[in-house]
A protein has these predicted regions:
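Charged, often glycine-rich, active-site loop that binds/positions anionic groups
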Residues: 84-94, 130, 213-221
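Glycine-rich loop(s) and the adjacent beta-strand/alpha-helix scaffold that form part
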Residues: 138-210
Length: 302
């Protein structure tokens, strides 16, 4: 569908990029080694250094290419000033980013087909021959698969995450803040044809989002950004991690996994009045109470 084009890119709002000196919307410097060390911490040391450094270095030059294709950048908005050194924000957000790319592609003569999911590929002797959209066969000299991952495929998520010690299937309670169309169809197809698989299917960019968010496509406005400013407990009232372990932009992507390991795959972030206005508020308002007992009552009602 045209309205859903671009996949998860439509939900993004910035790009973390390496730079050795101040640039238009970036202050100070964010050198390669610091970027690498940040990535190493977030992944717990489990990452491919050669591939990671390739991406990090490329991030220092990709913005010029993006500008050529109509993407504009702006300084961070209120609530995100702490990443003014590391992240370049897209003017208009992810939707504007996607629209700019599609306009550029159309100017270059690229034919865009909507409502045309590729069901399978014809691969012979390891070479691409054709792609199928229903009964339509489309031949080409080469094929680039930019079809996303499998994070919207509940069955595959179940297979990867399995059953925990409490007898729960954690993946059944996952909310996907991105596109519902990343089903991994072509990924499965390529694996069946002998493509190499790298990485760990249980690893992901998983953030803590509001449990009241829709099953798919809630986007960044459902992210809970107050974690580092308070305490987080599970449904049994137990804390399960150091909320202020590190600077929040370096740690927010681990909290989805941490919550997924808790009973019912749910947690509660509790802050006091001093934290109000110091983080990007989610689209759903939080529960407010004047006393701890009253707060507990409200929480039990959620």
């Amino acid at each position: 569908l045209r309205e859903w084009r671009g996949g998860n890119s439509g939900h993004t709002r910035n790009l973390r990029c390496m730079h050795d000196a101040p640039q238009d919307v970036l202050v100070d410097a964010y050198p390669e080694e610091e970027y690498w060390q940040d990535l190493l911490k977030v992944t717990g040391g489990i990452t491919n250094e050669k591939l990671a450094r390739l991406v990090i270095r490329a991030s220092s030059t990709c913005r010029d290419w993006m500008r050529k294709h109509g993407v504009h950048f702006q300084p961070p908005l209120s609530g995100a000033l702490h990443v003014a050194r590391t992240n370049a924000f897209f003017m208009g957000g992810g939707k504007a980013l996607v629209n700019a790319y599609y306009r550029s592609a159309e100017k270059l003569g690229v034919q865009i087909r909507y409502n045309a999911p590729v069901d399978k590929l014809d691969i012979q002797d390891g070479q691409f021959v054709a792609a199928y959209v229903g009964n339509e066969r489309i031949t080409a000299k080469a094929c680039v698969l930019a079809a996303g991952g499998f994070e919207s495929n509940r069955e595959w998520l179940r297979e990867a995450w399995g059953q925990n010690e409490r007898g729960e299937w954690p993946a059944d309670n996952f909310l996907i803040r991105g596109t519902q169309f990343n089903q991994g169809v072509l990924l499965k197809h390529m694996l069946a044809h002998g493509a190499d698989s790298i990485g760990d299917p249980t690893q992901a960019h998983m953030v803590a989002i509001d449990a009241r968010a829709p099953l798919y496509d809630g986007g960044i406005c459902t992210r809970i950004d107050c974690v580092s400013l308070g305490v987080v407990v599970n449904r049994d009232g137990q804390r399960f991690y150091d909320e202020g372990e590190d600077f929040w932009p370096k740690r927010y992507a681990i909290w989805g996994r941490l919550v997924a390991q808790q009973p019912g795959q749910i947690g509660y972030s509790i802050i006091d009045a001093k934290a109000i206005g110091r983080f990007m508020p989610p689209v759903f308002p939080g529960v407010q109470a004047d006393t701890l007992p009253r707060s507990e009552e409200h929480t039990s009602e959620l």
